[in-house]
């Protein structure tokens, strides 16, 4: 496990439903001394698609073995050692 920074891009998809209600009042200045009161409400549905980029800090597993497309590669010396051990065990 190694703690390190990650950087990359991403795509996001979102959906939301919301309702709101508000009440407000206001007072007009000179020369309009008028008091106003208002109320309102509304509902909405939203759908969105977005992209972004950023960094994060976390942990991930890192192996010291050399791999190519998921196949672990070993050195020739290591392979010869394994073959020699197999031949000793079979006799």
Swiss-Prot record:
Disruption phenotype: Growth retardation, reduced rosette size, slightly pale color and early flowering. Deficiency in eukaryotic thylakoid galactolipids and accumulation of trigalactosyldiacylglycerol (TGDG) and phosphatidylcholine (PC). Changed fatty acid profile in leaves with a substantial increase in 16:0, 18:1 and 18:2 at the expense of 16:3 and 18:3.
Localisation per UniProt entry: Plastid, Chloroplast membrane
UniProt signal peptide: none
GO biological process: endoplasmic reticulum to chloroplast transport; ER to chloroplast lipid transport; guard cell development; plastid inner membrane organization; plastid outer membrane organization
GO cellular component: chloroplast envelope; chloroplast membrane
Membrane topology value: Multi-pass membrane protein
DNA-binding recorded as keyword: no
Keyword tags: Chloroplast, Lipid transport, Membrane, Plastid, Transmembrane, Transmembrane helix, Transport
Membrane-crossing residue ranges in chain numbering: 8-28, 34-54
Protein role: Facilitates lipid transfer from the outer to the inner plastid envelope by bridging TGD4 with the TGD1,2,3 transport complex. Required for endoplasmic reticulum-to-plastid lipid trafficking as part of the eukaryotic pathway of thylakoid lipid assembly.
Assembly mode: Interacts with TGD1, TGD2, TGD3 and TGD4.
The name this protein goes by in its record: Protein TRIGALACTOSYLDIACYLGLYCEROL 5, chloroplastic
Species the sequence originates in: Arabidopsis thaliana (Mouse-ear cress)
Gene: TGD5
